């Protein structure tokens, strides 16, 4: 069972911003920028090349929605999206507000974000999603 499955099942804490029957989105605990969100299918699938095309389409659709929300929440014109597939064996899409290419780097993540910063990001993204609905 992956760490993401444990978060989805509420066995570990997660700051969720979106949930439906197939896909969830929650904040990463090591953000590249404030608002860095992971979009994850509930089904534990190791790699994006192995996912059913319909489910992958749903994951991408939710990623697009989260991208719009993080742009609105953090006043950016762009949202970055990365599929790395190396750190956790459970398909996930990194979506984050960005202002420059320098934001695209796992070497620059905040390894110890404050709980308040994560709570603020969660609230902002949820509010932006409500406005987009």
Swiss-Prot record:
Residue stretches making up the HIT domain: 3-106
The record ties this protein, via SUPFAM superfamilies, to: HIT-like
| Protein's UniProt name | Uncharacterized HIT-like protein Rv0759c
Q: Which GO terms describe its molecular function?
A: hydrolase activity
Q: Which PROSITE patterns match?
A: HIT_1, HIT_2
Q: Where is this motif: Histidine triad motif?
A: 90-94
Gene Ontology CC entries for this record: cytoplasm
């Amino acid at each position: 069972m992956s760490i993401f499955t444990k978060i989805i099942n509420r066995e570990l804490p997660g700051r969720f911003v979106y949930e439906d029957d197939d896909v969830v989105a929650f904040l990463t605990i090591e953000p590249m920028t404030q608002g860095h969100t992971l979009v994850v299918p509930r089904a534990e699938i190791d790699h994006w090349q192995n996912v059913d095309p319909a489910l992958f389409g749903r994951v991408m659709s939710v990623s697009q929605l989260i991208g719009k929300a993080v742009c609105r929440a953090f006043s950016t014109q762009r949202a970055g999206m990365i599929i790395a597939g190396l750190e956790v064996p459970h398909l996930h899409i990194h979506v984050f507000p960005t202002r420059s290419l320098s934001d695209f780097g796992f070497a620059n993540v905040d390894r110890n974000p404050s709980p308040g910063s994560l709570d603020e990001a969660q609230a902002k993204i949820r509010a932006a999603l409500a406005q987009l609905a």
